[in-house]
Every structure is written in C-alpha cells, then in structure tokens.
C-alpha cells in the first residue's frame, strides 16, 4: 500500500491515495449490492420532505439512533468518591464500551472491572463470578470501596446483588467491614441518567442506612452545611471546580457529593494515580446532617433527591442553569438556604457576562437553533438561547417525558423568542433529521454524534454536550456560573463568526463582507 516506514502518512491523507480509493470502490462493487445512484438519490430527497416527516413521526415500534446510552454507563459516572472501584456484574464487552466512552470524552483513563460473565453464568447464575471478581478487585487494585452494578445479562436472570455481596463477605473474599454499595442498573430500561441516579442513591443509602445491615443506621443531626450534586455532567471537571469557587466566594460550608473533578483529570507528573480525589467517606456520611441538598440536574437525580428529602433535608432541584437568569436563581437559592450574601466579586462577574452578551447580541438575535441532549441540559441551553435573543426552534430529547415537555413549553412561553419553538420528548435523531430538513435552522447544538446531522443536513453544529469525542479538552471548561455562561457564549459566537467567514470567501462576489473586525 501507499504507507511506508520512511514517511508515515496520517489516515486522513492516506485514504485519499489512489490504491485506497480503488480498494474502496472494489469493496462497494463486490460486497454492498448497491442500488443505482439515481435511485438512491431519489430516496434521499424524499426523506427530506414533509410527507416523509409525517410518516417518520408516526413510528411506534422502532427507534432510529436514539440519543441515549444505557444505565450501566451512567452508573460508571457516579464514581466521584475516594478510592472507589466501579464493578459491573456482567460481561467484559460491556465494560470495554463504558471505559472507552469515557476515555474518549475526558481523554483520561477510566478504570472499571467486570465479573466476566459468559454463557455459563448467564444460564446458571453469576454468583461465582461475583465472589471471584470481588476478591480479585480487592486484592489487585486495593480500592477503598467497590461500587457494584449490573448489566442486562445479570438482570435477565435475576441475580441478587445484595445476597451475592453478603455471600462474598461470608466466604472471606472481601472483609466484612469493607464498603460495597450496589445498585441494580438494567440496560433495557431507562438510560444513562437513570443509571447515574440509581448508583448515587445506592451509595448514599449504603452510608446512611447501615451499610446493608452490617452497622446501625446513621441518625440525622442537622447542621448548616449544604450538599451539592452535579448530576450526570460531561463538564464535571470544569463545573465542579467552578462550583467550589462560587461556594468559597460566598463563604458557604458545603459538601460535593460525587466529586469527579480530580477523578477525570489526573496530572501527568510522573506519578500514576489509580484513584484521585473524590468525596471522602466521612464527608458522605456527614452529608446526612446537611441543612439542604442542591442539585444542578434535578431530572437526572429524581430518585436520589427524593431519598434525600425523605431524610428530612430541604432539596433544591435545578435544571442545568446556564446564563444570567439560571446563575441568578442558583446563587439566590444558595444564599437563601445559607443566609450568606452573594459576594461583590460574583456581582462583578454577573456584570461582565451581561456586558459580553450586550457586545455580541447583534450576531445572536433571531438566530434559529436545534438542540439535542439530556433533559436538564436541554432546559439550560434553551433558556440561555432565549436570554440571548435566539430561538431554540427544535429541542429533541430522547429521555424527555411529558413533565419535561411541560417545563420546556413553560420556558418557551416566558419569552417572546419562544414563539414557534417546540419540544420533542421521546424522539430520536432520525426525527430530528426530518425537523431540520422541513423547518431549517441556522445551527445545531449537541454532542459529537450531532456531526452526522451536520453532514447530512448541511447545518453547522456547535459542540456542547456529552460525549464530545472529536474535540479536545472541552470538559475542562465550566458551563455553570457566570464564567461558564461566557464560555458557552464564546463557543456559540465562534461558530457563528466561522460561518460568516466561510460564506464570504468569494473574491469579488461575497468578500465585501469578509471583515477583519466582527
């Protein structure tokens, strides 16, 4: 082939070379049984019509590219506790997917183990796999805690995690006092946000309710602290550090539950850290006594927040607050609970954000957007766009339900820019394709998978969401707080200005607007 050891060519240029192009053509001709190009083109054009959109939206028993992942993946994200080893009772293949998915987003090792279930355990039960797996994980990786969850294989046959863990302790595979919280996370229902919610609740239940009956349940002794839960958040590295800064500026005594900021961002300083950062067990236990718990993504933590409320705490469930209004609401809630005033520094940061929006409003006003993502994320981004004078015309959320749609519609009704905007709960990316072709927008907002809609529809996209596989280091920047809103504003404006430049390149035709100053 064209590759040689003296001059290594990147795949982007390598696959353009004649021998590779010929190979691709031969594969298509020999194996793909392709229809004539004109017939394919006619079919493609028809799928862009209103007629096809009506048929597409009439689907009942088929999903085409749903915008969600499975519960166990979300469960892996709930690992922001000191020295915690995620343990999945299921196959190695499942865990390989979870690890690679997070590796590619955070550009960081994502350690996780499985019980290596195969055909025999799938028929006769996975008890022995669990017993051996816990013993190996404990002795080899030396964690402070092993957090166990399931996959569809273990759930279909009804494996009982609580009983299996107790048996492993009785056999001495792990010490009786060793922390092994668990959650059942079947892959065939819910989504990644459900899995995160189940695991967070499982970990808190373990610490607060007597560690599966091995110690007395904790008794709540209320104090003045505030707990904070970020939810399933692809920007957890930047966001958690920003939230800590905001709490510190207000002199608020707080505990982050599930702090993944260091877990997903270890330094390259010559020391390998299998475990880094995370909420300590003492902090997790003491969190029961907090005055209140504030969650930035209430929809993705419904069970966890309900459990915390049952313990007697005040709970505040927000929806990924981005922008001036969202951050105002968050800080006002924190101030009201803690009795601490919003600091002068934060008031200045608010003013800087307002100034930035005012500077750029002419480029944003009236722009139409299509958004896809998790329920709380969609609410937060749509709210910020309305604040900017933009129009979130299509908001598609596979994990959204009727309650989410009502929240979206109330948000649209709160702004004149929400007129003509629509929320689509339970819809997939093939639905979104029909929406963008029949009612075009100026920009798409979503995760890396949105790029295929960009290629198909010709609508430029802005990378915001989870996962971001094809861009680097976005997760290091916050999107919450006034500074986080500036980051989101810059990402949106950068793409708007890039499109302006691309559309004004024609020498003597469009370059009259190829401006040096925007």
From Swiss-Prot:
UniProt: [8Fe-7S] cluster binding residues: 70, 94, 152, 187
Keyword Methyltransferase belongs to the record: no
Enzyme class, spelled out: oxidoreductase
Signal peptide: none
Cofactor comment text: Binds 1 [8Fe-7S] cluster per heterodimer.
Any single Gene Ontology cellular-component annotation: molybdenum-iron nitrogenase complex
Taxonomy, superkingdom: Bacteria
Gene name as annotated: nifK
GO biological process: nitrogen fixation
Claim: Calcium is one of the keywords in the record: no
Organism (species): Acidithiobacillus ferridurans
Protein name as catalogued: Nitrogenase molybdenum-iron protein beta chain
Assembly, per entry: Tetramer of two alpha and two beta chains. Forms complex with the iron protein (nitrogenase component 2).
